[in-house]
Amino acid sequence: MDQMRSYTINKGMMDSWVNLFETGIKPAHEAMGIPVVATWVNADHNQFIWVRRFADGDDVPAKEAAFRESDGFKSLGSQPGEHIAKMDIQSLEQGKLAA
């Protein structure tokens, strides 16, 4: 199961956010067995979209709890919240397209 996360980043903070994501958030996720499989920044430079992967939907609560208790997450402190104005999270399941 994949989870697509779309964040509206505060004005003028995208470069700082991308750096924080690449050096702190992504490694902290991957250290807990939550791979980040894709990232994008929209053309207006105010939205950051990323996808993280779980074995299945049942895996999400335990993995998220372990992540929030990890040293990697704790070391981020308030930095993520200082960058994010709005957050939207969608759970995605791979399916077959109808003919």
Residue spans for each PLM region:
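Short, charge-rich amphipathic segments
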Residues: M1-D2, R53-D56, V60, Q90
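Short, structured motif recognition centered on aromatic/hydrophobic residues
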Residues: M1-S6, W17, A28-H29, F48-R52
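Short amphipathic alpha-helical segments
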Residues: M13-V37
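Glycine-rich beta-strand-turn "strand-cap" elements at beta-sheet edges
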Residues: M32-I49, A55, G72-A99
